[in-house]
Amino acid sequence: MNIDIAETFTHDNLRNIYLTNFALSKVTGVDNILPLHFSKNQSKEIDTIVSKVFFNEYKFTRYKEKLISKGANKFPRQIAIPTLRDRIVLKAINNYLQKNFSEKLNIQVPQQATRDVKSSLMSGQYETVIKIDIQNFYPSIVHNKLVQVLESFGVEKDAIILIEQAISTGFHKNQNNLVGVPQGLSISNVLAEMYMSEIDRKMDNKNIFYKRYVDDVLILCSKNDSDGIYNKFKFEANCLGLEIHENDPKSDKTTIKHIREEFSYLGYIYNPKPYDENINISIRESSRKRFQDSVAALFTAYANAGKKRSKALLFWKLNLRITGCIANNKCKGWLFFFSEIDDMRMLFEMDNMIKKLCERHNVEYKGVKKLTRAIHEIKHKKWNNNYFPNFDSYNFKSMKEVVSYDRGIAPHKLKLSDQDILNAFWSIINREIRSMETDISSFS
């Protein structure tokens, strides 16, 4: 059932958004307001939001800037962090857009996109693979063109006014951008999908396989059609003010290859060389190294902890890194993300690397979980068993154990109220999930 913007910006709905999504958050914008402070004036703050939105007077505060490395010789990704009040408003807008228009969009998680690619490769229908990367995608989205797209979807004028306010806000006072959607906002992804929807529709053709995940495009087609299809996508992108990386055999950004040649997409390597023909899908070396470095960092932290060194904490963090977890009813972690690989040789090598790290640091390997077993459990849909921690089902005793590991205190010496333990537990879990997500944050 569709909802309008007036139904979205009610006191009760905004309060529910705050309590569900942000009440335990420790992230702050430029005003440094935490939920602890916001909660003291929660009712008044929410009433102010409702009033200002109703009269089209709501203004966003400039965003805090966070830079995320994309690797050597690359400009970092610029992430916008809104204030708590703005995050509530943005989440409400996102909910409005998702509930009303998501059925008109083809939004997929990377794993499903990868399964579709695998299926099409195995069909034997195609001869050529075209991989296209859009340059500076989010910073290049033209606002007036985006507004036209939103209007064509039927987005209400009051919602468009709010969206324009949000995307024109920058990192400096009085900044009024006309181009670019800040990355990191809860509305960024759905706006990008709506912006690209017309290209997706025009590229839909029964004679080709077309897949786009944000700014990464993969097309499978016949050899004779490849140049024309490539030029068509380039033309349509240019019409939206977007530029693509030019076809360059020496680059991995945009390429046109025979379908049996090695190529990468969404962090996966297809037809990897020089492995044998039994391996169809592996992962990029950079993705593998990022995971290995994160595991090695756990042992380094353990070695440097001195008197606070805890094998229990090391085992907990290490096994969590290896298997991933279930939290907030979602599968999280490196192996869940790359669950479509069939490169068991690589996983055996990584298990062996972890074993050697244990030996080097005099840590018993017996209690360490295995990537090779975890991938088997995932592929056979057995990840609901005890091999993977399901934090949603943890009882109070288990939560207390996690908090005690993290603080280096025996559970019986932990002097916290039940609510404090609950808050501390989810703060730890969210911290570890964010840390795991950095292992897969850059796959394009």
Language-model segments: which ranges?
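Conserved polymerase palm-domain catalytic core
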Residues: S119-V214, L218-L242, E246-E262, K307, ...
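A structured, charge-rich N-terminal accessory region that forms the first stable segment of a protein
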Residues: N2-R62, S69
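Active-site and adjacent loop segments of nucleotide-processing enzymes
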Residues: L266-S444
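Reverse-transcriptase-like RNA-dependent polymerase core
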Residues: S51-K74, I160-F171
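Charge-rich, low-complexity segments
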Residues: N32-L36, K44-V50, S119-S120, G124-K131, ...
